[in-house]
Amino acid sequence: MRISRRQFVSWGLAGAAVLGTEGIGGAFYGHVMRTSSRMDEPIPSVCRACPAGCGIVGYLRNKTRLTAIMGNPEHPTSRGRICALGMAAMNLQLHPERLWQARGKDGATLETPQALAEAGGRIARLVAGGARVVIDTWDEQQAHADFMAALGAPATLIGREALEYAAREKGMEKVWGTEVRPDLDRADLLLIFEDQPLDSGSRFMPEAQRIIDAKVDRGMKLVVFDPRLSTTGSKADVWLPIRPGTARPAALALLRHALEHVNLSQPVSMRGQYVPLVILAETIGAYTFEYAAQVCGVDVALFAEAGRLLVESYRPATMAGLPVFEREDAAAAYAAIALIDLVLGPLQIPVMPRPRQVPTDQAASPVAAETIYREIEAGQGKDIVLISHRANPVFERGDALRKALTSGGVAYHLALGPLPNETTDVADLVLPETTPLEVHGRVWLTSFVPTPTYVEQRPVAPPPKGVLRTQDVFGALAKHQANGDTAAPVYDLQMVRDLTGANTFFSVGTGIFACDAGYDPKLRYDVSLRFFRELPPFELHEPEVLRPVLLLHDGPVTNRTSAQAKWLAEIQHDARLFLHPDDARRLRVHPGDLVRCEAVDGAPGAAVEVRVFVSDGIRPGCVSLPVEQGHLVAGRLAMAKRFSTAHDPDMKMIWWEDEGPGVNLEPLLRREIDEETDVVKRPLTRLRIRKV
């Protein structure tokens, strides 16, 4: 019998397929290292590198060594996918600069039990004397609630994960009554306004995979309105590089065009009143494509193409990014975007408020958190005990806070974390603590699931010897307080029950539990027709050519709370100023030139120096910088400095030492308090740019 090459190959592939499925009895199976036949124990957990809360599986060898992190296929939102930041979390667990011992302000090391006793006793004495405790953390936990209950005095928790997108959540609540998200499983057209869901975000991986799946499987079209050509814009069918802050005229022009192709006798409900579409069409009649193109600064043909896709779609949906909610025109801009959903959809799904581990009266609002740090910077925080837990406020606020904490701007500053950063550098006492990979917890999923669901955050690796878990650290501190044996109620479970009427939680996967009731409030468009009638004409500010507008973009491979992981630093280690060729010619700069950027409305002398990257992927009059880079003292790795290969053999391969670690943008940024909506906004910043 002669065997052809085709038959041989096909038989080989068939045999490999059979062998490949042998022994797989569920969603998880042992991870086999390429250089070894040993099997590693799979432990399902959840990633805490960003607010998305994707499912991970850590592979543990001999119950001591973490060998790999992969996606969890049972997780209902991430569905087995994982990003570079999640995979590199393992790199932080084995970081060569990890904190192993407690450290005082003078740099002297202390034994952990001694340091805990010292910190707990000092906090108790200060609280007894009238001091107030403020906990600043990215990872809100039940341990914080237990510690605050033990204090026997008022305390405040700044939960940064809950506050990061507060402006967007508040803006949506004002229009719909709750935060919403587009139904990506049904939409055939997605209009994205100044958002980059394929780059980063609070629901980065779940949103990105659903958008790509919808494009590939169902042919969903993307129309992106964004001044910068991000990864999201590069995947769009139409990219409109609009001027920053012009989402309102862009959205109303599209809606006006769509109303020309629908039955105008049909009504819509606006703030409880039924409004015929013919009256709505008359109200926004001035927003033509020609007007929008002039205001937004784009070719009218792009609006015509976007309008054609909108008219041809059956199930359009919208998505608005954080910049939409931080502009001066925020209320009108999102009301206009949501009006497209109201008239042509709506394909928006309610998102349940994020369950909190501490009661609402103890959780700081965005304005309250900003006020606390302004008090410290102004020298009015002498009665504050500040506990920074895996947070890095000095990196985010800059020199003013660093000077205040260095000069005793608070009564006591305790920092907890696994790695050094700018905030631990100025703390009175630093306690080493576990990474999120080494602790227990509970992470709530409130999007892309039919009912509110939580995932058990299981330790996928043991902590280093002598390093305590979060629960143990705060438990030891609590023993020294007035009500040391007091435990706080489990507030997040009660919050979900109150919002949904749930009675029980049942298992839907390994360590995944869903409640027996869904969060499904009736969406009500709470903006009146009169609001649009009274809108003032859209005004353009000074010509863009005089001072370019600074745009900020998040990098998915950097971590502002600590030093960069070496694997991620290899991907993106430097910050570049994205500049349009027309602006480069006007400023007489070339790719790679070093320029000095000063904020027009910034503090005198506040500036950063950065190298230029010339690209057509940004509109003229705008420049862009990544917001999460530029560590100042967060370890040698983040500063692109070599150190002994005895600590980590990979360090001899650092090749970006001469290029630097990027820039910290804090000197250029402003924060404005909006007391009406109780949020803190970052207004547009205009720059003076000159070649160094």
Give residue ranges: language-model regions.
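N-terminal export/assembly segments and adjacent metallocofactor-ligating motifs
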Residues: 1-261, 299, 430, 585, ...
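Glycine-rich phosphate/diphosphate-binding loops that line cofactor/substrate pockets in enzymes
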Residues: 117-134, 180-189, 283, 304-317, ...
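Short, glycine-/Ser/Thr-/acidic-enriched flexible segments
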Residues: 63-65, 72-76, 88-89, 140, ...
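Long, contiguous, secondary-structure-rich segments that constitute the structural scaffold
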Residues: 458-516, 567-577, 582-692
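Extended redox/cofactor-interaction regions of prokaryotic respiratory oxidoreductases
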Residues: 145-225, 232, 248-253, 294, ...
